[in-house]
């Protein structure tokens, strides 16, 4: 066991070196040995994944014991922070070497040959290194896109090609991290929330919630112990939003009314919480007699126009969402005194404004139909 832990120590140092200028001294033989070392650890991952004591010992070493004072510094090598990462440590090593300009030409050529050996016999039970490398590159691309492409404005976010790409990458990543541990997707989303531009991340989540379910890859169908429902990626997003009240409040405040209506129609679990937020926002407003409008006490309060637009959008949704919204408004109106006169209850005024808007819309549609028949 101690020999295995020492082997892990040495590989962690090797992985740290792979991003430095020290690789300029590597020749093809060094690259080959490094990859063999990485593949051995991948074999360890596959062999001892269900062996509790060995897995625990390796996890403990990865977290605490495999960085020596006076070496490359304390803390885990990025990308190799847990036992699950051993399953693709050859991919991590290859990607670091490919990105390191200090690697010599001969060593780089040998690395590329190892990654893309050409046609030949393939182990049917193993994913090829180039496929794993491509998958990891997609993950990095997803984070890069989420971080640096948040400033495009498009009124129809759900149709924006860039947003849809980011959403699909996010769902795919959630599907991958969910295989290792049930709680990992939530932690992954929380880390993205802390690291990425938050407004853009919220938009990507909304678009992801409108995407069709991801199809499962053939090898996933054969893997024991993995039970994926078709919409699990979107369900993870829904549960994460509902479990983080501040994030969900920001989600509802930052996104356009029409997009939120689409999302809450698709995912009914979100609609009661969204309606609760709208109710809270409405209760913060008071009627200004001089201006003749409902206004907020503080600058962050939602203005009347926005509140009206959000309720109006929800009332244009198909049942049962539309019915729930109207019932909620009628309930609030009754609890507030059931007034019919404007200016006394914001719920009365909202219902009057919504009915007036619906009446005008019917008038316009009727006029258009009449003109078309002339």
Curated annotation (Swiss-Prot):
InterPro entries: FANCF, FANCF_C_sf. Its main location: nucleus. Keywords: DNA damage, DNA repair, Fanconi anemia, Nucleus. It comes from the Eukaryota. Changing residue 209 to R: Reduced monoubiquitination of FANCD2. Pfam families: FANCF. GO terms for cellular component: chromatin; cytosol; Fanconi anaemia nuclear complex; nucleoplasm. It is found in: Nucleus. One of its GO terms (biological process) is interstrand cross-link repair. PANTHER family: FANCONI ANEMIA GROUP F PROTEIN, FANCONI ANEMIA GROUP F PROTEIN FANCF. DNA repair protein that may operate in a postreplication repair or a cell cycle checkpoint function. May be implicated in interstrand DNA cross-link repair and in the maintenance of normal chromosome stability. It is linked to Fanconi anemia complementation group F: A disorder affecting all bone marrow elements and resulting in anemia, leukopenia and thrombopenia. It is associated with cardiac, renal and limb malformations, dermal pigmentary changes, and a predisposition to the development of malignancies. At the cellular level it is associated with hypersensitivity to DNA-damaging agents, chromosomal instability (increased chromosome breakage) and defective DNA repair. Belongs to the multisubunit FA complex composed of FANCA, FANCB, FANCC, FANCE, FANCF, FANCG, FANCL/PHF9 and FANCM. The complex is not found in FA patients. In complex with FANCA, FANCG and FANCL, but not with FANCC, nor FANCE, interacts with HES1; this interaction may be essential for the stability and nuclear localization of FA core complex proteins. This is Fanconi anemia group F protein. It comes from Homo sapiens (Human).
């Amino acid at each position: 066991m101690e020999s295995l832990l020492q082997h892990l120590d040495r590989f962690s140092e090797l992985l740290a070196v792979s991003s430095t200028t020290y690789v300029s001294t590597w020749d093809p033989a060094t690259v080959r040995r490094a990859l063999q070392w990485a593949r051995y650890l991948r074999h360890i991952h596959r062999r001892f994944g269900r062996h509790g004591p060995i897995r625990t010992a390796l996890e403990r070493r990865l977290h605490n014991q495999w960085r020596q004072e006076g070496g490359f510094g304390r803390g885990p090598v990025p990308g190799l922070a847990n036992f699950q990462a051993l399953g693709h440590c050859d991919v991590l090593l290859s990607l670091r070497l490919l990105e390191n300009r200090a690697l010599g030409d001969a060593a780089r050529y040998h690395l590329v040959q190892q990654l893309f050996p050409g046609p030949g016999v393939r182990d049917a039970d193993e994913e090829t290194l180039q496929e794993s490398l491509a998958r990891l590159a997609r993950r990095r691309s997803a984070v890069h896109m989420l971080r640096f492409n948040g400033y495009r404005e498009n009124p129809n976010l759900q149709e924006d090609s860039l947003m849809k790409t980011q959403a699909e990458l996010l769902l795919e990543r959630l599907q991958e991290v969910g295989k290792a541990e049930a709680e990992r997707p939530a932690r992954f989303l929380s880390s993205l929330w802390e690291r990425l531009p938050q407004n853009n991340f919220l938009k990507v989540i909304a678009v992801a919630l409108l995407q069709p379910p991801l199809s499962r890859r053939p090898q996933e169908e054969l893997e024991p112990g993995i039970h994926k429902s078709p919409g699990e990626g979107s369900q993870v997003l829904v549960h994460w939003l509902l479990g983080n009240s501040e994030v969900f409040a920001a989600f509802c405040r930052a996104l356009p009314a029409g997009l939120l209506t689409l999302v809450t129609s698709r995912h009914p679990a979100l609609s009661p919480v969204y309606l609760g937020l709208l109710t809270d926002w409405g209760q913060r407003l008071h009627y200004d007699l001089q201006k003749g409008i409902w206004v907020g006490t503080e600058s962050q309060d939602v203005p009347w126009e926005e509140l009206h637009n959000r309720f109006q959008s929800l009332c244009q949704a198909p049942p049962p969402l539309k019915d729930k919204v109207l019932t909620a408004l009628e309930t609030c109106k009754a609890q507030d005194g059931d007034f019919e006169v404007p200016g006394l209850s914001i719920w009365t005024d909202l219902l009057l404004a919504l009915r007036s808007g619906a009446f005008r819309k019917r008038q316009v549609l009727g006029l258009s139909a009449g003109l078309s028949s002339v």
